UniProtKB/Swiss-Prot annotation:
It catalyses: a 1,2-diacyl-sn-glycero-3-phosphocholine(in) = a 1,2-diacyl-sn-glycero-3-phosphocholine(out); a 1,2-diacyl-sn-glycero-3-phospho-L-serine(in) = a 1,2-diacyl-sn-glycero-3-phospho-L-serine(out); a 1,2-diacyl-sn-glycero-3-phosphoethanolamine(in) = a 1,2-diacyl-sn-glycero-3-phosphoethanolamine(out). It comes from Schizosaccharomyces pombe (strain 972 / ATCC 24843) (Fission yeast). This is Autophagy-related protein 2. Disruption phenotype: Impairs atg8-processing. Residues 1465-1490 are annotated as: PAS-targeting domain. It holds the Pfam family ATG2_CAD.
Amino acid sequence: MRLPSWLKNSSSWLWTAALSRTVQRRLLAFALRKLIGSILLENVQPEDIDILFSKGVLMLSNLQLNCSFLNAVVSLPMINFTKGTLRRLILRLNVTDIVNLNVELEVNGLSLEIELVPPDESLSSTTYEDAPSQLDILDNVVEYMNKTASQDFEDEVINEGLESEIDGSSHNLLDSILQKCLASTSVLMQDALVYIGTANMSTRLEAKLDFMSFSSVKSNSTSRLLNINGITVSMVRPISKSNAGSSSPPRSEESFVSMDSSSSIVEGFENDLSPSQVTLNESSIISSNREEESFYSVHDSVTQKKTRTSWLIFQCSGEFRLVFSIESSNLLVIESHVPSCVLNINSQVIAFLLYLYGYFLPAPSTPGFSSNKPPLTMLQLDIHISSVQILTHCKLPESQDFSMHNDVDELLHTIPSNGAVFEMKINQIQIFNDNNDIDELTMTFSDLDIFMDSVTLVSFGKSLQSPCSLIFKKLERIVSLFIHIPGGEISLPLGKALLLQESFVEFTNDISNLQNFLSNSDPFKRSIQETFEAPKPFEVEMNQPSFEIIALFDELQLQILNELSTQSLYKLTLRVSHLQFTRKSTGSLSSVLIFVKKIGCQSELFNCENSDWTKVSSSTAFHLSNSLFETHDTTGTSNFAVSIQQEKHYYPVFQPAPTEFSYPEKHFYFAVDNFNVFISKEVVRLFKTLYETIASSLVTPVTPNKLVTSDYKNVLKIRTRTFSLSLLNDDGSSFALKCIRIKHYMCWAGAQLISLSLRLYNVSAEYLSESLEILPVVSFIRNLRNDEKYLLNADFSYALKRSSGSNDNTIFVKITDLGYEHYPTCPWISDLLKTYFPQDPEVPFLAFPDFPFNIKLDLRESIIGLNPRTLEAKLLLYLKSLDVEIDALVASNPLNIRIMAAETVVYIIDKLNQSVLEGKTSVLKREILNSSLHFPGLSIKDTIEFVVKSLGYVEISQLKNLTLSLVVNAEEGVFSTLITVDNLDAQVQSCADSTELLIKVLSDLGSTEDEEISDCYLALPIEDYAKSLTEVDYNFFENRGIDYKSNPTEQSTVLVSSDNDISSQEIKIVDDYYISSNEHSTHASDLASVSSEEFVIDDGSSSIIDISDELQDESSSRDSLKKGIELIEDYYLSQSTSKLESSVEGKNYLLKVKFKDINVNWDLHDGYDWEATRATISSAIEKLCDSSSQNDKISPEAKTLLFQSIVIKSFSKVGRLNINHVSEPIDSDEFADYLSKSISYHLRLGKSKSKKIGIEIKDLQGSFTVYADSNEPNAVLNDLDIGLKDLIIYDHLSTSTWNKFFGRDSRSPSSKNRNQHMNAQIVTVRPLPELNNRELRLEFSVLPCKMYIDQDTLDFLIRFLTFQTPSSSETLNTEPDLPFFQSICINATHVTIDFKFKSADKVGLRSGKLPDLGSLIVMQGSEVFLRQLQIYGLSGAEEFLNALLNVWLQDIRNNQLSKVLNGVVPIRTMFTVGRGIKDIFVSPVRGLQGNHSVGSFRHGIIKFTEKYVNDFLSLNAQGATGTHSLLRQAESYLERGSNASASASRARSYYAEQPETIEQGLRQGYSGLKQGLLGAKSTLMGLPRETRSHKSLGGVAQTVGRKVPLIVLQPMIGATEAVSKTLLGLSNSLQPQRRQDMREKYKRPG
């Protein structure tokens, strides 16, 4: 705003004091007459001026204003003053003081009519070239008077003869007089009325002013005072003839004001009354029953005499006081006090105001406004406003439609009958600035309230001491608006909120439609729209001015109320602390930023009982701290990026982008320090109800297609420092997930995902059971090499790839250093699914949903922990590398999953309790802290292995090269899963105690939770009990020769057969079986057949047998065999496991697991892994040692049995036993040495360094199938079919010379014809559908095999496999639920046994046990045929094994004893000679009987000679080798000396290095003989030298006594070796098969 220089000082024309008083009066009278005459339509007569100067008062009535003068002084081209009237004009003048001029102007009944017109392009630009940029009417008045009255003033000066008195230009004098008049004039105005409208409609904007005064605060002061009372702004429209019944003037020809054109002096004007005016009742605004007539009315105006319609827009009924002053050339001071104001708007009013405002927007060709005067640079404001009330009337969707109107005026004044009223009220407003800075303005207010139909929606600052504030700043090129709200509350009843959004949508739509309607009805606006061209996109530079809006809320509370029913209410409360909202714009660049220090969400449920609302539940939904959200887009701009900086507040900074964008992008960035989410079923239900209510009530439904558009590329970034998710289940348990850091990036365009990245750091999860037990589920594993603050555990990534016309959409997931804990007793996954995803049984799952993305999971360096139900042990699976591929789900295809595991390590621990961890915690923490110093070169593998073993775990297995595929089908709501395992290499290494624990852990993990199974074995009720007794066969026992009257304890249990007679059932054995089965099994017909009394056949399937644990005598064995056992004669060459396949053919499976190419290597180690086992053994040994040292005479038979397998015998010669090294490997020293010396020995019971037994399983294959449940009797539930190509047990004991313990018999024809060595099929059935019990059917077959049994190896296996901890023994004594076998079929097989005796148990010999008697001999090539067995009705594996042993041992003893004795080395030759002699005589007889040929005699002679020679050579070779071995041992003893300690060495067999041909035998025999002779020579030649070293005769005799036997033995050793090697070479040349047998049987050297 430009300030005139004369306004700065009212006494600027002091030079006029030199003029005479008469001249001054005449000049002032002329100036006033010209000034008033210019304002009015007619000039003021000189007589009127004379009256003014004589009486000091001039009053004029019924005046018309000079609109040309008004248009000239108000130099805006779009404003045209068409008519103006004054009812009364009073001018007062203090004529006594002309120098200090004091003029008072009073105006009554001012009426102005302003018409907005489009700019006239024909006008010259010079007309407006000096127009002010802001209104300065006083300057324009002076300029106007200079143009119109300057010449008249000069003529007046000449006519009056004042040239001599006026020195200078009369033009300057006139300016001074006018300036003095205007500066010293005080204005009083009453009843002012202004109409603003356009020429094309009758609707006008009416501004009414009741009273206004404008004057100086004090005389000779620069301050001006403006007082206004009663301001009213309305939108009015005259009613047409058809509506009012009276004539209406045309819109452009007549004005709203009528008057007379005469002027006269009116007396008594002080008593005139002002016209009535429309007033607002403030109570009616606040009242909920406000009527529209308070704002819209049809009335008769006193002055207008015309009926009209009006809408009250603005009203201020109090006193408006404004004081402003000019302190310097560029400083303006304004003080103002504004009373309560009311603003009442609707869509028609806003559209009409926007329509009028459009005339003030210059067209491109309109001359601009410019000024050469300096702008205002300093401003001092102090404005106080009592209150501002804004009322907004919104039309509801069902209200009247505006588009049905054709008349513009009627449309603007059509008031809907139904609508919502929104009210906003602001109290105690103050606007000020500091330091006179116009670039910084501050606005404060005490409180702000928003109502909707008298219901409070928003309340800010009411309950706090500090006021709300708005600060406007302009600093350099940044314009900012800072809004500070100390506190507030937003309460949104959901019904009101939905009505609010509906009304807002209708409100904005009405404004838009009305604007378009008004623009189309105006030719000027229509022409502008037709010629308007959209601005072209422009490049935005970073140095353009920026505009910022910052809104800060210290405390904010948002409440959402939703009525679920008439008796239920849901309340959602958001509590926000320090909320910052920022919007920054630079040109077309725009960014929105939201920062929240703390935000919490709480949900509450209320029920109404007896008209009282009671809180039922309350829960916290989520909590955030220090969260930041920012969004911007690059639409129509150059490439730029946004960075966030923090000083006092967070604010975005625009920077040039490093890369160019291909098309517009929208960016969303979200960062939060702590994000905690708490979810319960109630919270989910309430949020779901809230979402459904909002979604169903939206005016424009939100769909995925409307959320995204393909024209934009959307980018989302999320950063979370700490994230936690808590899920509460129905049973009171909860699941908590926590991430220390989250990084998320996602890019999409429309509905197309472009890229995705999600990184989770330091992931952990816990499960809180119903009993408040905290169980860790997921945990992160730290890398001890690097002290990383954040460890990446999960990485999800996706990138859209297009190749060869097809989309390869794959989501990559990488999981590293993550641990998962599995608890069978806490099924947290099923609990979560039951709680949050309940399945409706009436709505089956028909098909998988479409998921067009492949998933590739890469799992590295992770651990899975398996926690049993009832044990303290734990199993760890260390997954070094695991790859999972999941195919996309498209078009109802099955779910395909492929799993590849390169290497997995299995660890186990016996007790996972605090006592175990306490000893390891300090060490582990120290190693973690100092890992970079102690372990700088450790790999991830070594580090995790170190941590696991430090906690007490033992590595028990390694699984490599696992390949698994999974296919899941969903057809008609039924799932069928096919799992295929194509490859697996398993390496197992364990001790006896860890093996026993592993079996128990796997059994515990595979078992199901205990359930009520009381109806499993209930007998069916007998409907007719009497009838059932009549069906008893009383002769049953008599027919079987059983005395049922005797003592039942002395009788064996007899099983009742269902149909067949037991006496007629016998075992039939084919005598010629051995002839056709094996050439080594001829002449089996000579064996005695089994009588029919030995076995009993039982056809029942539910029999229970009782088999004695030991084979005591023949009669007891026969009684034991009469218990549901059936021997079936068949040849194993024709054996098949297809007998059970017919029962499962054609059934639909639910789960099927197929596996093949599985290889298992199991290394059995001596010693013990667990500290508890070692402590028990060491304690027992220590007790025996103590008792041995105290008692000289101890029974040699005293012994202690530990763990059902370890026998510790008493011994007397033992010294101190040190148990401090009990955890060291057991093979660090020989235990025998400990017991042979009377010194301190170290007891070592730890795991042996080397394996003792190696079990190798090759090509394990088979399938496991689970079938759908059926209500049929004996329904098959599942079946297991398993087979293996080879099962080999290697003997690695140092005391054993044999290589294998068990393996396939390669000489058998069936081993060459069949691929699988062993095969088993187990079928699980349910006997009756109404019972829950399950029964098994087993079929097993094995090919002929060969066993090389060393007694030490056998003892180790027995001790290893029978190991049982006391806890497991107690468990077995509690009568567990053993599996029940309906039927067991064991197919026949052939076993060849070699057995080496080493020691015998004297107690066993005295008791007459068969195994101990057999240990006195050595067997080689003993052949045993195990017949096929069919067993019915057994419970448990123990009964099953006892039945097998009893039946097979009895059969071997009765029918195959000759085959067993044939393997005894001394007897084998006798049998061979006897069979040879038999062949000499039997073969010719059979030849003569057959074809009358004597050639069979020669064949018999050749066969006899071959067998005899081979056995003779083998027997002599064994004798020579045995003699050589004894001589070698004697030589070793003599060389070491009798007092030297025997060094432990690995047992070596001389048969392992035997020559394969006669040439090798002769060569090796010659070499051995030569070494023996050379050794004797060397010993003999060294004897004199050794005797000379001794000085005494005793030493010489001792040396000679030791060396002379060596001289004699060494040639004998060479000779026996020569004979042995020669005979072995000759025997192997004659028997090629024997060479292969020796290679398999004996260990090779090295």
